[in-house]
């Protein structure tokens, strides 16, 4: 079974054709996805070749591809740096050509440029990528069954009267 490519994730996609602007890739349900020529300078890729890319959308909502590896993928919970603020929210750097919006409604409190925020990558009702700091809406209060000695990834979220609240494996508190 083939996994359908989703925005905010990395996938190996097949090159369909070479065009003036870059390469058109087979994005499955997303349709043709552009990998801009500036991303593939010096590489010889052609129809039938596979290339590992990160999928995101441009300013007009069209799916795009990049060879860059982002700092966050769909469903992950890292600290990201706020690079600017605007009348719709803040923008965080995820290592891709277009910064991600952290809308005011998704903030835990006001954020400033150069601050770091703990966020999860998700999408809005229209399917556009965004981040949220309202982690309670996305994380479970119960962890999967772990065995003693299992490795987990932890991200400290904030302190409480009892200690620190941590995110376990990007999906639970």
Cite the ranges covered by each PLM segment.
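Single-stranded RNA-binding regions, centering on S1/OB-family and related RNA-binding modules
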Residues: 1-173
């Amino acid at each position: 079974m083939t996994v359908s490519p989703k925005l905010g994730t990395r996938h190996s996609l097949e090159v369909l054709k070479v065009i003036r602007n870059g390469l058109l890739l087979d994005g499955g349900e997303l349709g043709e996805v552009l990998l801009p020529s500036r991303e593939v300078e010096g590489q010889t890729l052609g129809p039938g070749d596979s290339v590992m890319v990160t999928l995101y959308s441009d300013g007009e909502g069209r799916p795009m591809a990049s060879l860059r590896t982002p700092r966050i993928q769909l469903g992950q919970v890292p600290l990201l740096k706020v690079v600017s603020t605007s009348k719709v929210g803040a923008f965080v750097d995820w290592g891709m050509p277009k910064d991600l919006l952290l809308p005011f409604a998704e903030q835990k409190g006001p954020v400033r440029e150069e601050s770091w925020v703990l966020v999860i990558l998700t999408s809005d009702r229209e399917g556009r990528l965004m981040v949220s700091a309202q982690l309670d809406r996305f994380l479970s209060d119960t962890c999967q069954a772990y065995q003693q000695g299992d490795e987990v990834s932890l991200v400290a979220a904030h302190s409480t009267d009892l200690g620190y609240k941590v995110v376990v494996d990007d999906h639970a508190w």
